[in-house]
Amino acid sequence: MTYARPADRAGALRLHLNENTGGCSQAVIDAIRQITAEDVAYYPDYSALLKECAEYLGVREAQLVLTNGLDEGLLAATVNGFRVAQPAAGLPEAIVPAPAFEMYSVFVKAAGGRVISIPPKPAFEFQLREICGAVTERTRLVFLTNPNNPTGQIIPREALREVARYVPADVTVFIDEAYFDFCGETFLPEIDAHPNVIIGRTFAKAHGLAGLRAGCLIGDAGRLNDIRNVVPPYSLSVFAVAGWRAALGDRDYLGWYRTQVEESKELLYRAAGRLGLQYWKSGGNFVLINVSRVGDPADFVEAMATRGILIRDRSQDPGCGGCIRITAGLVRHTEVVIEALEGLCAAAS
C-alpha cells in the first residue's frame, strides 16, 4: 500500500488536504527572511526551539521529540514499537480503527508489520470494545486519531484511558492529535499516568507550517529516548526551526484562524442541511458530507475541480460511501465552495 497524493491544479482553491488556507503568520515569513548564508551552511541547532516548544505545550523537554512533520514521528514510533519487542511468533501487529489516516497502514507495512483494521460503526462511534478485543500477544501498537480524520469525531477521554489501561505495558498507544487546535480535546494531562501513550502533534494545520514540516511526539521520557534512536539527528531544516519558533510566539494569529475555521464549519453545516445532505459535525478543520443523494462523489469532486475548487473524495474509506471531505478554512473560501456546492446540487435535481 502506498499513499496516493491527491492531484493538484495550479491556481485552484485547495480545500482537499486540510491545509491552512490563510497561510501562516507574517512573523514566520519575517523570521525566515533573517536566515543568513552561514545559517544555511551549518547543521541546525534545535535547543532553543525544543525549550520553547516544551514551554508552549506545558511539558518537560525530556518528554518531547521534534520531528520533520508528524509523518516522521509516526514512522519513528512505528519502527521503534516493532523494534523493541518482537512477538515470539508471527508478524508484529498494529491495531487501526477505521476509517483512518492512510499513512498508519503504509508505515506499519513498511516496517514489516501487519495492520489489524477495526471496522467502523454506523454512526462512527468509537470502537472501544472491538479495539480491546483485537489485542493479542503480537500487538505492538494501537493508532487512535482524536479527532478522527476523515470523520471529525472526538474520542471521549475516558475511552482513551480504557485503551491505555487495557493493553500490555509494552504496547504503544499512539494518539494522533493533529487537529487538536480546532477542538481543544487532548490526552496531554494524562501522559504521566500512562507511560505507554505517545501523543503526536503537528503545527501544519492551525499554524500553517505544512510546507516547513513541523511535528512532535510527546510522552514518557524513557520511551521517547528509544524513539530518538530512530529519528535522524538533523531532520529539521534551519528554515523550519526559525519559522516554527516564530509561529509559537504569535498567539493572535492562531486565535484568528481558529475563529475562521469555526465560522466556516458552521456555514458548511447549514449549507449541507439546506441541501438535504448528510454531514457530521467535526472537531477538525474539515467537514465530511455525503453527496450520494445528488451524484457520484468522484464525479462531484471532478466537477468542483473544473470550477477551480479542490476537495477530497473519501468514498473509498470504510463507512464513508458517498462522502466527500471539504477543508474549512477562511470564511471567504468557504462561501465560494458553498456557492459551487449549491450549483451542483441544483443541476442534479
Regions found by a protein language model. Give the residues of each.
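N-terminal small-domain helix-loop-helix segment of the aminotransferase-like
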Residues: 1-72, 76, 348
